[in-house]
Design a protein with these regions (language model features):
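Residue-level detector of beta-strand structural context in well-folded domains
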Residues: 11-12, 22, 51, 88, ...
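Beta-sandwich interaction modules
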Residues: 13-14, 90-91, 159-160
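Short solvent-exposed loop/turn micro-motifs enriched in small/polar/acidic residues
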Residues: 17, 45-46, 83, 95, ...
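Flexible glycine-/small-residue-rich
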Residues: 26, 64, 94, 104, ...
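Structural motif
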Residues: 27, 54-58, 105, 124, ...
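Non-cytosolic head/periplasmic domains of membrane-anchored proteins
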Residues: 70-132
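Short, surface-exposed interaction patches in beta-rich subdomains
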Residues: 80, 111-183
């Protein structure tokens, strides 16, 4: 058994302070933002990948510790039989999020049950899903994937009212973008 597969996987509540904005900058994690009963950030993954988390001026900031970017890979484990992709779950009881910024290299991003009025999501490899956007405009682009808006395939890009004050901008290199919104 290699060292990576024998490392302890932890489940930990990192913070429970109140916030209305989210800023995430990680290199390797699945990110999920959802409605919950409390303000909190949950982490599940290898202890050494535990992110730095703080709340400043009601903005939740989640980032790799000490700015170190960790590549979740192993040359001898090409099919990822032993890898554990960290899961960061951000919960808030309010149904509205003032702003969201996520920059993640490898991992999925899911925003579920939270109204997102504006923000920026930049992902290199995996899928992005925002299920309840209240933005005034959209600028969505993927290099290798599809953009789906309210169940309709829009090809590899979608733009609507992208000069508005509250715009949701999503850029993905390899993966699909799925957004639902009213109106």
């Amino acid at each position: 058994m290699n060292k990576a597969s024998s490392e302890q996987v932890v489940q930990k509540v990192i913070t429970n302070r109140k916030f209305n904005q989210v800023k995430v900058d990680t290199s390797n994690a699945n990110i999920k933002v959802k409605q919950g009963n409390h303000y909190r950030v949950l982490f599940e993954g290898r202890h050494k990948l535990l992110p730095k988390v703080e709340v400043k001026n009601k903005q939740l900031i989640v980032e790799d510790k000490d700015g170190i970017k960790v590549v979740n890979g192993n040359l001898f484990d090409l099919f990822k039989k032993h890898s554990v992709v960290p899961q960061i779950t951000i919960e808030l009881p309010d149904e509205k999020l003032k702003n969201i910024e996520i920059d993640d290299s490898n991992g999925s991003v899911t925003v579920q049950g939270i109204a997102v009025s504006q923000g920026e999501i930049d992902l290199s490899n995996d899928n992005i899903m925002v299920d309840h956007s209240t933005a005034d405009g959209y600028d969505l682009d993927t290099s290798n994937g599809h953009v789906e808006i309210n169940g309709s395939n829009k090809g590899d890009s979608y733009s609507k009212n992208d000069k508005a004050r509250r715009v949701l901008s999503i850029d993905n290199s390899n993966g699909d973008i799925t957004v639902s919104y009213g109106g």
